[in-house]
Amino acid sequence: MSLRINDIAPNFTAKTTQGEIDFHNWIGDSWAVLFSHPKDFTPVCTTELGYMAKIEPEFTKRNAKLIGLSIDPVENHAKWAADIEETQGAAVNYPMIGDTDLAVAKLYNMLPAEEPGTSEGRTAATNATVRSVFIVGPDKKIKLTLTYPMTTGRNFDEILRVLDSIQLTAKHRVATPVNWKQGDDVIIAGSVSDDEAKTIYPEGWKAPKPYLRIVKQPK
């Protein structure tokens, strides 16, 4: 069964480049970004993990932890990290899971479809994960899922933007419009009546339509 937003993120234990972890305990009171890549020592993955290393401080500012995953053993991850630093100019400073038995990949549906049949008999020797992303909240619930094909590198600035939106809307009864970024105007949630909105936003709001109430981003 596929995982959906608001499902509890399945817990697991796994070997990583920073030691064995229990996923829920590792998250603690933080947010988490779990992302898979197809294979170590491959070009697109090298650019992705290098860029994530560069922007990791931005996630830390937001109380969010990063953790990567592929079917490769942690020993390969450690060797590959040197190539990433050399070519991308950033040292991988977050743990990477060595999911050699595909346990986490199957748990999080990170494997591509197989025609015909299913993924039941797959082994790490013959399979690779697609480019999946899961944002998990401190409540251990899934807040976002994204899946990219193996041939397309992800836009991790977009993951950061979505995290900003998720954290903002968890705190305030607002929604973020198309192409929103930190500091832009937001939309008052439909669940907030006009009377409630007058109390929350005494300065008022713009409303080109009654259902489209635009206000400055709350602090």
Cite the ranges covered by each PLM segment.
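Chalcogenol-based redox active-site neighborhoods
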Residues: 1-219
